[in-house]
């Protein structure tokens, strides 16, 4: 797909002035064609791996902030970038730029903060980084590193004015001091349906506990295990025993009478044996 065809595809039914971002990566053209100054709202333009050899067809794009031109065949003519005076981030990595002199026009881009020339022959120049920072006063990051070889930490947020929480004053500490963060338990108030459901759960739990206590008491009694028990369990166990004793009183009296008769019979039999 040619660059012109890709532009038409990305545009669709929109007016050029409505488009703020345009991705034309991997389309094919040696020159920039199809772009006009009608794209006045364009802020991000990407033309990676297109095969560009020249930037001469680049239109005036005053609002453009990010321009991606990596993996092309550009070796010079960077003065065309002055048509976009507000560029902040420029990626020219993996191109054919060999000389530091080719970079001189970039010194006039007063908003340029991040420049990437990785995999370009120019990076082999002695003191390349030092010379580049000296040449472009506004430059903060070169190939992802600052002058002290520290990595670029803010990325696009830095280019957009910084979005860190300290700058905005909306960090965790600020929220805590303002009272915005409170304990969830203080805010939560269950509705009537939820309270009824919770009460049902409590009743079920109480019944389950009573059943467990009765079972434990019965098991301990059957095993003749003595020891401290929970008061509720002991009372229930004594009530059960009293009920059993009351219900079996008549049987106990019968058993006692039977025992006395058995003793008397035994005595009589003993006497007979002695006689």
UniProtKB/Swiss-Prot annotation:
Pfam families noted in UniProt: LRR_9
TM ranges are none
Q: Where is the LRRCT domain?
A: 120-158
Record bears the keyword Amino-acid biosynthesis: no
Q: Which UniProt keywords apply?
A: Leucine-rich repeat, Repeat
Could you tell me which residues the LRR repeats occupy?
18-39, 41-62, 63-85, 86-107
Please note every region of biased composition (Acidic residues): 180-216
Q: Which InterPro entries match?
A: AN32, Leu-rich_rpt, LRR_dom_sf
Q: Where is the composition biased (Basic and acidic residues)?
A: 258-267
In residue numbers, the region (Disordered) covers 176-275
**One GO molecular-function entry:** histone binding
Q: Does the keyword NAD apply?
A: no
Family statement drawn from the similarity comment of this UniProt entry? Belongs to the ANP32 family.
Q: What is this protein called?
A: Acidic leucine-rich nuclear phosphoprotein 32-related protein
Task: Say which species the protein is native to.
Answer: Schistosoma mansoni
UniProt lists the gene as: SMV0119
């Amino acid at each position: 797909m040619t660059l012109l065809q890709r532009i038409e595809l990305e545009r669709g039914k929109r007016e050029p002035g409505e488009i703020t971002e345009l991705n034309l990566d991997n389309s094919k053209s040696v020159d920039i064609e199809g772009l006009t100054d009608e794209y006045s709202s364009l802020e991000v333009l990407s033309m990676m791996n297109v095969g560009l050899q020249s930037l001469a067809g680049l239109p005036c794009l005053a609002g453009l902030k990010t321009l991606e031109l990596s993996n092309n065949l550009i070796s010079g003519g960077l003065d065309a970038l002055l048509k976009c005076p507000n560029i902040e981030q420029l990626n020219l990595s993996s191109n054919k730029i060999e000389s530091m002199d080719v970079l001189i026009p970039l010194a006039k881009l007063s908003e340029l903060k991040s420049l990437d020339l990785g995999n370009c022959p120019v990076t082999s120049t002695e003191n390349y980084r030092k010379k580049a920072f000296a040449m472009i006063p506004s430059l903060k990051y070169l190939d992802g590193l600052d002058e002290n070889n520290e990595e670029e930490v803010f990325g696009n947020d830095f280019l957009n004015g910084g979005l860190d929480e300290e700058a905005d004053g909306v960090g965790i500490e600020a929220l805590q001091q303002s009272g915005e963060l409170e304990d969830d338990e203080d805010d939560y108030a269950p509705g009537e349906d939820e309270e009824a459901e919770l009460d049902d759960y409590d009743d079920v739990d109480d019944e389950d506990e009573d059943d467990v206590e009765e079972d434990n008491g019965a098991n301990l009694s059957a095993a003749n295990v003595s020891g401290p028990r929970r008061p509720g369990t002991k009372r229930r166990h004594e009530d059960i025993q009293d009920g059993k004793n009351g219900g079996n009183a008549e049987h106990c009296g019968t058993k006692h009478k039977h025992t006395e008769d058995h003793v008397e019979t035994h005595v009589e039999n003993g006497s007979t044996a002695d006689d």
